[in-house]
Amino acid sequence: MMARNIQAPATSSMGRLFDAMAFWCGFDGVAGCEGHAAMMLESWAAAVSGEEMPGEPYEWVMHEEGGLLELDWRPMLKAVDDDLLRGVSRGCIARKFHESLVNLAFDVAERFSLDRLVLGGGCFQNAFLLEGLAGMAQSRRCQLSLPQRVPCNDGGISLGQAAAVVRQWKG
C-alpha cells in the first residue's frame, strides 16, 4: 500500500514523528486516545534525569534551497537506531529526542535571527518539551509565544497557517 501511495499520505506533522519514535521505542500500538503514543514518549523522557542520558541530544540537518528550509531527520533516526542497537533505554532515547527538538527550534531561530518563537500544534501540549523550550528561551534571551485564545493542538494550526500567509503577502 505504501509503494502505491494508498492510505499513506505524505505529512510534515511533528506529531507523526512523535508517534513513530514512540513505536520505535516500544510503544505497543494500542492507543487509547489521540496522541497516546506521544504521551508515552513524553512520560519515558520525563522519567530520566539529564545525568542518566548517554551522549548529546540527536542532531538534525538543515538544508536551505530556494528560500525553503528543510529539516532532515534521517541522521537523527540513524542515531536512534544506533542507540537501540547498543541497548540504550527507551527513556534515554525519548529524552535525547525531546532535547534534540528543543535544540532544533533554537537552531532555526538563530539561523533566521529570530528573537521570538511562536508555538502551535498538538506537540506543544507536551509539558516536557515546553519546559525544555522555556529553559532554553531564558538562556538565549528569546521569547516564547503560546496560543491564549485558540487551542494549541490541531484546532489552532489553521490560525498559524493563516498568519504565515498574511506575513508572506505583506513581505
Listing of model-derived features with the role each one plays in the protein:
Residues V108-D115, G120, M136-Q143, A162-W169:
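Hydrophobic alpha-helical segments
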Residues W24-D28, F124-Q125, R149-P151, A164:
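Short, glycine-/Ser/Thr-/acidic-enriched flexible segments
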Residues M14, L84, G121, Q148-R149:
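Fold-independent oxyanion-binding glycine-rich loops
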Residues V118-G120, A127, L133-I157:
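Conserved phosphate-binding/catalytic loops in two-lobed NTP-binding clefts
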Residues A105, G122, L159:
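Hydrophobic, well-ordered secondary-structure elements that form the walls
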Residues H98-E99, S145-G171:
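Glycine-rich phosphate-binding/hydrolytic loop that grips phosphoryl groups
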Residues M1-R116, F128-Q138:
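A contiguous, well-structured pocket-lining segment that forms one wall/lid of small-molecule binding clefts
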